[in-house]
Amino acid sequence: MSTRALIAKELKNGKYKTIYCHNDGYPKGVGKTLLTEYNTEEKLDALLNLGDLSILGKQLAPDPTKPHRHLDWQRDVTLAYGRDVGEKNTGAREYTYRRLLKASDADYIYVLGEDGTWQFTNAKKEPTVWKNLSEELQSEIQASEKQEGNNETEETEGLTQSM
């Protein structure tokens, strides 16, 4: 099952230029890629201009000498419904804040604010609780590293006890 997401840019008029992404919408997927690869207004604008996505990749443009279409796409390259699949009416849309929260059945919503920081919300569980994406990913990494350290300690203790 897909983890769907909306990707948006806060506009000066108070609205949000928004596209849909069908796959890997969780913070360690789409969130991490947005934070590391689409961290400037210019890069995000280029992404939004592609319209709705099947897959968000680290790169926008495919190698023109290789196939890049649905079920045969280039790894780490964004797969856009309009450009790569041939679907119609997939362009970015402008939403008010209220409409953004109700725009789709997305699991997560990511917004690059006017201040240049990525924020996100779990639209299914807490749609009005926004978190700083960078801080949240850092916390998840630290928690994961701590858990791995605990597992290594348990494994070492188990080896010591069995000797």
Predicted regions: what they are:
Residues R4-K9:
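Short beta-strand scaffold segments in enzyme catalytic cores
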Residues T3, G25-L34:
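Extracellular/luminal recognition modules and glycoprotein regions
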Residues E10-K15, L112-G116:
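Short acidic-glycine loop/turn motifs at beta-strand connectors
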Residues T153-M163:
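Non-Sec secretion/translocation targeting segments of pathogen effectors
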Residues E37-E152:
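Low-complexity intrinsically disordered segments
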Residues T18-G29, E126:
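Short, solvent-exposed aromatic-acidic interface loops
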Residues Y16, Y20, Y108-Y110:
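Aromatic side chains
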Residues M1-T3, S104:
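Residues that act as N-cap/strand-start positions at coil-to-secondary-structure junctions
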